[in-house]
Amino acid sequence: HTRSLSVSWLGDVYKRQVVVLGIYYKLQTFLYLPANGIVQGMRPLIGYNYGAKQHARVKKLYELTLIMSAAIMAAGTVICLFASRPLMQLFTSNPETVAIGQTALRIICLGFVVSAVSTTSSGALEGLGKGAESLVISLCRYIVFIMPLAAVLCHFLGANGVWHAFWITEVLSAIVAYPVYRKAVGKR
């Protein structure tokens, strides 16, 4: 799991950052939940329309889901940018941890909107019965990009490098996800 691997990179030196990472993952669950729900709802619809050879509907469903997910994630970005302190204070009263968490949320949330591309593409591929292609996107998000980026950026930026690894991973994953989706949909 990404969280366990990220924590191992931070180790004992960054105990407060490890706490912040745990808090972020709790918040992430709530921030991504509405977008993930929309993606879950798209899966059977896109699969049905693909099977019925209604390719224009497949495209429309993908685009609509992408727009709705991006809008939800834009709201999440705004919340994290402007309410990072109260969000952190839901979990801790330690001022140092809150300060570190504010920085983390403000950096990580920069990738929220673009994450809609990989989550929508991955969900659409699953709905189309193309699990291998969906797995490629998931592996990019959770292992291929984030772990090396976190290790390298942590070396140069300290714990903030881990936070930057999140949004950079989302950008790189989106760059991979959309062409993987397009190629898979092109195979009829």
Name each model-derived stretch.
Residues 46-111, 152-188:
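Short alpha-helical transmembrane segments in multi-pass integral membrane proteins
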Residues 119, 145-152:
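Transmembrane alpha-helical segments of integral membrane proteins
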